[in-house]
Structures are given as C-alpha cells and as structure tokens.
Amino acid sequence: MKPEIKEKITATNQKYLKKFLTEEAPVKLESQLEHMDWSYLDMIHNKEQQRGTFSPLAAMELSEIEANKDKYLATGLDAVKNGKVGAILLAGGQGTRLGFDKAKGMFNIGKTKELYIFEQLVANLMKVTNQTGTWVPLYVMTSEINDGMTREFFEEHDYFGYNKDYVKFFVQEMVPAVDFDGNLLMKSEDSLAMSPNGNGGWFKSLINAGLDKDLKDKGVEWLNVFAVDNVLQQIADPVFVGATIESGCVSGSKVVRKCDPYERVGAMCLENGKPSIVEYYELTPEMAEAKNENGSLQYGFGVILNYLFRVDKLMAIAEKSLPLHVVEKKVPYIDENGTEHKPETPNAYKFETLILDMVYMMDNSLPFEVDREKEFAPVKNATGTDSVETARALLEKNGIETVSYTHLTLPTKLEV
C-alpha cells in the first residue's frame, strides 16, 4: 500500500483499515482507497444542509402550452431533426421495493403480457423518432450493481427496436459509506462499502466515461434527463423542448399539478431568486397551503424527474463541485474480525449529489406543466400508492396494453 494512503488511514484513525498498515491490502481495496475523495470524511462534522429563502415560481400551465402548441412543436421538432437533443436515462437502481433483485428497468410491468419498464420507455422515445425520422441519442446510466445485466438485457431484446448505434451506457460513480464515528465501512475483505453518488452525479459520470466527446461529435445541445421509474415519461418531447427554447431559459422542468398541498413530491420554486426545488418535508404548513389570487397553490407544481438542460451550461457547472448531501442509511458491513453485520436501523452516512442543485446552478428554468394522468405513472412500490398496480392502470388508461390476448380463454358455448 502506498505510504500516502497509510498516512491517511492513520490520520483519520480508520478502525477497519488499521490492519492493512502491516498486512498487504487486496488490489481492489487499495485502488478504491487511492481514488476516493478523502475530504468526504470531513463532511460528517458539518452535516447541516443550509437552504436559502424560498419563494413561488410560476409554471407554464397547460392552457398556455395548448395556446402556443404549434409554435413550440415546430421549434422542438426542428431541434430534434437537427440532432440537437439527446436523452439521459437514469437507470442505476434495483427493484428492491418491488421484490425484484435486478435492474429496475428489467421489471415486467405487464399483467399477462411481457412489458418491461425499459421497453415502455424506449417505446415512448420512439414516438419522437418516428415523428421526426431522427434517432435521438440515448445515454443510459447504470450502476456497478446492474451495469452488466442492463447491457445484456438490451442486447437480448434487440434494444427494443431502437438503433443500437445511438445507445450508449455509462456507470454511475460510487462513493464510500462511513459509520457515525467516521470509519470507512467494509463490504467485504477486499472492498469498501460503496454507494451511488446520487441523481446529481449523472453528468460528472458521463464525462468520466468520455461521453462528453460523443455529445460534441453528434452536435447535441440539449439533454433531456429522466428517471427509470415513471413508465409514462415522454422523452425528448418536442413541445417541451420548443417551449424551453422559446422561453429563453437554459433549462426546463416537467411538473404536475399537486393532488393536495402535502403531496410527497418536490415543488418547483425560487431559492434566493434562483430556480430550485423545495422538498415536501421542507415546506412549512403556511407555505404548503399558501394560495395565489386565483385560488391555486403557490407551491402547487411537483417535479417528476424529467428535466431539460442546455449542454453548454452543464459543461460550465461541471467545472464546479455540486454540494454533497449527507444522509443516514442502513449499510451492511463486516467488522475488523470479518464478522458480517446487517443493521436494522441507520448506522452510516452516505454522500449524495442531487439534481436539484444542478437546477439551482442554472440561470433559469421553465416549469412546464404536463397532464399527470398522461405523463406520471411512478413505479416505486409493489402495491398501494405509486405502485405496479397504479402504473398498470394508467398505462391502460392511455391505451397501452398490459394484457396478452393469447392468454384469454374464450367460451366454447354461449348460454342463452
């Protein structure tokens, strides 16, 4: 092990790593220690996340969008046809809450018909490629856990009809977890306990994979970022793209009208005069229930993790560091004796960057309202709210079949 790594282990009094001061460290572990950012350890002593002053931010509502739809559509279609729009699928998660141990996008959302989440999202994107005759570059962010299976799944299913030359994969960066005393946790004898760096880390991970060159070579000027767990995501939506361009904003955020003041979604707002997202738990009752003159909620539009960013602005903020958020989580680990521990309560800190900070670092952002029944079908739980059941119902409501009619048994004789 390199002397400088040993010095850091000693200086930070690493309980689970001390034995490697005298023993030979596994190659994988040594590489992790060499490449990790040790300054993360200082953050656990300054965990408070300071937010600024929130104020409402008006959205472009459905009525205004409809009134100007032809103009926005023409502008957006022109951008897509000229190869200026790319898409980023954030797909690093597992389907754990669905009782599914593979990549979440591999989950079959159909009832008796095979309909995978990845398949439906690609079908949504294909609407635009069919409309424009142009393949939209699709960049899929995976994680260390599901990268191999995700790539294989796309290959096995022939990319669900998409042009494979326009699909690139990259792996989300991982960061170490530490216990409440600042000790780096070990997942195994040869590896730290690592976790993804949050949904704000996607652009840095894309750059580290060398795909910024691909963006430049293809002439991509706008990136539409969307999450894997909403099967009704409309991607590279030309009306959204056109409205954002016409507004003069450098970013756009798709939003839905909240069901009630306390719906558990982040709301678009201004923070110290800059575009931002206030989390539902950060809203005071007064803010949550505050209304405009027309009776609508001042913080009444929730984000659905579908954003549009101008690439040159992304490149500019990539040179700066996004704030790191420290969150408490349950992290399995092995101790210095090799004994495995699976805690039932939070035992460690994880470090995450958040996409809301990317929005905040933009000069402006257009909140763009969409019909929640047409564009918001989250798949977060096996049953109940935002579940497989509710997503299927919304798919069917939008004319997307989840039933295979070859499975239906027709009666051989009708009773009169």
Each PLM stretch: what is its role?
Residues 8-66:
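Low-complexity, highly charged intrinsically disordered N-terminal segments
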